[in-house]
């Protein structure tokens, strides 16, 4: 039986919120909050993959296993691919990518992503989404939207408002029920993950700054389904960070 591992990619030089992995949340750095949250799962191992010696030192101080990676990776998935190669995971194993800026991610969703990949044998990656309930979120580029087919395979991901409802120009007129927000959690088959870093980086991946588009561009399938539990958006801005701090301080 395949082992299932969690890898948390943690880059220090975030563009929108510098050093956010080390941002204080109720007395602990965010990366520690994420790590402690995922330790509630029952997977075989949990690893932090980082390009920062500072993050490595801090993470090891609270007991995490850490792999130091190069600092020139195109995406978090590329970073995880390097870590997986260094760790020697078997090709049949599954790795779940939990973003280092999601300290409130429900454990049920992590387990769901892994199980979805096990169930969908044609897919090399699985991920989750949830219905958008606020029309403003459709137009927020920080909320990635996704459309998928009747068999629950992703067709496209975008920061734009997809699908486009032709004939409606006013936000109030849009049928919001057909819009889904992508939740940034991925499960990969290790064999594919090792191959991912060798794939062509597509123009659309660069244009949208969405690593999952490399998978679709190269003809592979991403399985997707609605999440078991609602997932708060990740911490991308100072405003996001303040919201999370308030939740931990309640």
From Swiss-Prot:
Domain of life of the organism encoding this protein: Bacteria
Q: What does the UniProt record say this protein does? A: Activates KDO (a required 8-carbon sugar) for incorporation into bacterial lipopolysaccharide in Gram-negative bacteria.
* EC number of the protein: 2.7.7.38
> What is the reaction catalyzed?
3-deoxy-alpha-D-manno-oct-2-ulosonate + CTP = CMP-3-deoxy-beta-D-manno-octulosonate + diphosphate
Q: Which InterPro entries would you find in this protein's record?
A: Cytidylyl_trans, KdsB, Nucleotide-diphossugar_trans
Q: Which GO terms describe its cellular component?
A: cytosol
Q: In which pathway does it act?
A: Nucleotide-sugar biosynthesis; CMP-3-deoxy-D-manno-octulosonate biosynthesis; CMP-3-deoxy-D-manno-octulosonate from 3-deoxy-D-manno-octulosonate and CTP: step 1/1; Bacterial outer membrane biogenesis; lipopolysaccharide biosynthesis
Q: Which species does the entry assign this protein to?
A: Francisella tularensis subsp. tularensis (strain WY96-3418)
Provide the protein name.
3-deoxy-manno-octulosonate cytidylyltransferase
Q: Name one GO molecular function term.
A: 3-deoxy-manno-octulosonate cytidylyltransferase activity
The record's subcellular locations are: Cytoplasm
Q: Name one GO biological process term.
A: lipopolysaccharide biosynthetic process
Q: What is its main location?
A: cytoplasm
Family under the similarity heading: Belongs to the KdsB family.
* Record key words, sorted: Cytoplasm, Lipopolysaccharide biosynthesis, Nucleotidyltransferase, Transferase
